[in-house]
Amino acid sequence: MKNGERILLCLAHMSGKEMGFIKEAFDQNWVVPLGPNVNAFEQDLERFVGQDKKVVALSAGTAAVHLALLACGVGQGDEVIVQSFTFCASSHPVTYLGATPVFVDSEADTWNMDPVLLEQTIR
């Protein structure tokens, strides 16, 4: 790797319509994580996953992790396995609920959680 060369973790996919949606949200003063665009997104996603499923859009990935942990019943004294190659928002909801994050290292070639180390951690 050359000095100063960046490794991008992901590239954003833009369809070209984003600026119009942003302008619409500002024009209608819906610049908070609610409003007609959020409602439409939730409804579209409910139709996609099936009408028997419910969808809730959240303002941040941290909020989504927190809600998922609550839905799983995670609480005081629990341990939650977390990938070590992550942003702190992956572990903060764990500690907020009184649980302990247990970090597992990643594979060098994929950057995904190492399944061998995961198995060792579970044992």
Model segments located where?
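PLP-dependent aminotransferase-class I/II
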Residues: A99-R123
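Conserved coil-to-alpha-helix start sites within the AMP-binding
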Residues: T86-S91
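N-terminal "arm"/small-domain region of PLP-dependent enzymes with the aminotransferase-like
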Residues: M1-V32
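Phosphate-binding glycine-rich loop
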Residues: L34-E79, P93-L97, F103-D105
